[in-house]
Amino acid sequence: MLQNVTPHKLPGEGNAGLLGLGPEAAAPGKRIRKPSLLYEGFESPTMASVPALQLAPANPPPPEVSNPKKPGRVTNQLQYLHKVVMKALWKHQFAWPFRQPVDAVKLGLPDYHKIIKQPMDMGTIKRRLENNYYWAASECMQDFNTMFTNCYIYNKPTDDIVLMAQTLEKIFLQKVASMPQEEQELVVTIPKNSHKKGAKLAALQGSITSAHQVPAVSSVSHTALYTPPPEIPTTVLNIPHPSVISSPLLKSLHSAGPPLLAVSAAPPAQPLAKKKGVKRKADTTTPTPTAILAPGSPASPPGSLEPKAARLPPMRRESGRPIKPPRKDLPDSQQQHQSSKKGKLSEQLKHCNGILKELLSKKHAAYAWPFYKPVDASALGLHDYHDIIKHPMDLSTVKRKMENRDYRDAQEFAADVRLMFSNCYKYNPPDHDVVAMARKLQDVFEFRYAKMPDEPLEPGPLPVSTALPPGLTKSSSESSSEESSSESSSEEEEEEEEDEDEEESESSDSEEERAHRLAELQEQLRAVHEQLAALSQGPISKPKRKREKKEKKKKRKAEKHRGRIGIDEDDKGPRAPRPPQPKKSKKAGGGGSNATTLSHPGFGTSGGSSNKLPKKSQKTAPPVLPTGYDSEEEEESRPMSYDEKRQLSLDINKLPGEKLGRVVHIIQAREPSLRDSNPEEIEIDFETLKPSTLRELERYVLSCLRKKPRKPYTIRKPVGKTKEELALEKKRELEKRLQDVSGQLNSTKKPPKKASEKTESSAQQVAVSRLSASSSSSDSSSSSSSSSSSDTSDSDSG
């Protein structure tokens, strides 16, 4: 048909056909096609250009995205396909070939439209969803299936595009499996400014259709401006002849954009159409189809999503804030209770609340949406879900518990979130997409949870809890192999005790809540006891012992120094009120050394024999020492320090198997709470045992290990510290102190100051007795040194 055009007809009738002014404009065979919109001066055809224009191939018109004659709806399934399925597919790395219609001319596929009779792409489906083109979700799903089928039909199975389509189709089917089962039409809520919104919506729909249609027609890449008569009148609202569009586009494309679009969108709403006309200019002036579609597709969703956000707030806000409205309807008592609980939100729980808000935010919605709501096993056809998953968990439940202040600490919050992820890993196969989504979301959670701030210490109201964790943390810092587990146990114990105190203070809680909390606390205590038992039974490394020895040595030196200072103060005390004492000693004429020694114990008595000295010194020594105990009952009830408990635990572990039965018997006899426990599997927590029980255990263990019982006022020397180095150090220290004391005595031996000599010698003897007593549990070398030092002190004073 194109060959019938003769040269003498071209100057007149060619222009007429081109401008749509002659009768040939409507004839399809006489239409002259334009290869590109970028060439200027196309209106003056020549003989050379006519055959090139006539032989250029053409793309068929793209599928319609809006049809006023065909009614559309907004349903829950269509909204799910738009917000979830389309969003996930559109952002996928393999989605780029499917975002716009196949350009057979640009890609050099002349047979594409002969094989594929019904082209489809995701850009068309997306615009149809935005324009409410579909009546039911099945129509949209059919379009998706058509798009994938076209790809499989035209391409070879080994092509990359086929693999990309298969990946997208797999994601599509997985998303559709989570779609609501029953399709329900959503009521479109009209906002307050309904007139403006209605006009804006109508103008928006008109401008969107023209925006997508005009660039689609004008952007058939480098081929021809094909304007089909039945298509344009339905989309461009008030233009009767398609040739009117083509003529200004051909004459001046850059200047014709805004007037054309303003005219086309004028009947629905002129002001908005003008605004859209500005955007249309940017669309039509872009040279390539990809450049046209790329601004077109992001530019249209903001306009189309804006009214949808106003019309359909439940789906937009459902995942973010589902609980806030019911909280306003709570009774006053519950509101007061919640407000009181709100005040007790700790820093760590505030951090957890921020993590929860981030998990529910739009930033992570692409892979977090399966975890927003509880798994509806019946709707999804997962009949074995609740048989496999015994404790379901989801983010809405976590949010509800957080708002109701059901979490007492960050560990409970983290346990629920991790339970949700572990349920997903447990039920789904490892290669499932929802598992990958869970792992991605868990990475976000763990990264934020690792930045948990430390809880500030509260020294005032909890003396027990503040005393215990340092001990536990001390043990964890000393042990190199079991550091992390002991730290976690100490934190859990501290939180448990804080929780117990909170339970006592919150008298308004119901009995059911108390029972529930007590049960949870008992479970946590049981877990902590298991950890402590495992820690106490674990091997202790040698560096730990060395560190302990150094610490013990420092403590012992400090204690001895304090004892010496106390004795010196006691010596200084009696000196002041006795100035006339030297006169009495002069009158007595007892200037010998024996009199000084004998008069020392009684502080002023002149009689007595030397064999009474040990008894008197024993009687007078306890009042000088501040840490002594008067009776055995006080000794039994004296609380154990952390080091003593730890040493007792080590000693019990050293006992042979046949001796452990007696240990269990002692504990069960003295601890009512452990009487009903199984003797074979009893767990000993030294922090909960009475001091009397611990002392009885200590006596029994020492008797089994054949150790000497410690005196009440001495610092307990741990087992395994009888090395020669320590003995030599002690010996040197004792000798040095004795030399100091004897030197002081020798320098102050003058007749008028016998009373001061007596007090100095008494201080010396008390110090010697104290030092020898403190080293009584040491080896023979240290005991012999202490006895020899006491002999030398006696000889010096004699």
Curated annotation (Swiss-Prot):
Consequence the record notes for mutating I161A: In BD1-m4 mutant; reduced binding to histone H4 acetylated at 'Lys-12' (H4K12ac). In m8 mutant; abolished binding to histone H4 acetylated at 'Lys-12' (H4K12ac)
Where in the sequence is N-acetylmethionine found?
M1
Q: Does the keyword Acetylation apply?
A: yes
Q: Mutating Y112A: what's the consequence?
A: In BD1-m4 mutant; reduced binding to histone H4 acetylated at 'Lys-12' (H4K12ac). In m8 mutant; abolished binding to histone H4 acetylated at 'Lys-12' (H4K12ac)
Q: Which UniProt keywords apply?
A: Acetylation, Bromodomain, Chromatin regulator, Chromosome, Nucleus, Phosphoprotein, Repeat, Transcription, Transcription regulation
Biased composition annotated in UniProt, kind: Basic residues: 542-564
The tissues in which it is expressed are:
Predominantly expressed in the testis, followed by ovary, placenta, embryo and to a lower extent in somatic tissues.
GO cellular component terms, semicolon-separated: chromatin; cytoplasm; nuclear speck; nucleus
Highest taxon in the source lineage: Eukaryota
Which residues does the record list as Phosphothreonine (modified residue)?
T6
Q: Where is the signal peptide?
A: none
Free-text disruption phenotype from the record? Embryonic lethality by 11.5 days post coitum (dpc). Before death, embryos are smaller and exhibit abnormalities in the neural tube where the gene is highly expressed. Mice with a hypomorphic allele display severe obesity without type 2 diabetes and are protected from inflammatory diseases.
SUPFAM superfamilies attached here?
Bromodomain
Q: Where is this motif: Nuclear localization signal?
A: 553-557
Give the protein's biological function. Chromatin reader protein that specifically recognizes and binds histone H4 acetylated at 'Lys-5' and 'Lys-12' (H4K5ac and H4K12ac, respectively), thereby controlling gene expression and remodeling chromatin structures. Recruits transcription factors and coactivators to target gene sites, and activates RNA polymerase II machinery for transcriptional elongation.
What does the comment on domains in this protein's record state? The first bromo domain specifically recognizes histone H4 acetylated at 'Lys-12' (H4K12ac). It also specifically binds histone H4 acetyl-methylated at 'Lys-5' and 'Lys-12' (H4K5acme and H4K12acme, respectively). The second bromo domain recognizes and binds histone H4 acetylated at 'Lys-5' and 'Lys-12' (H4K5ac and H4K12ac, respectively).
Report the protein name in the record.
Bromodomain-containing protein 2
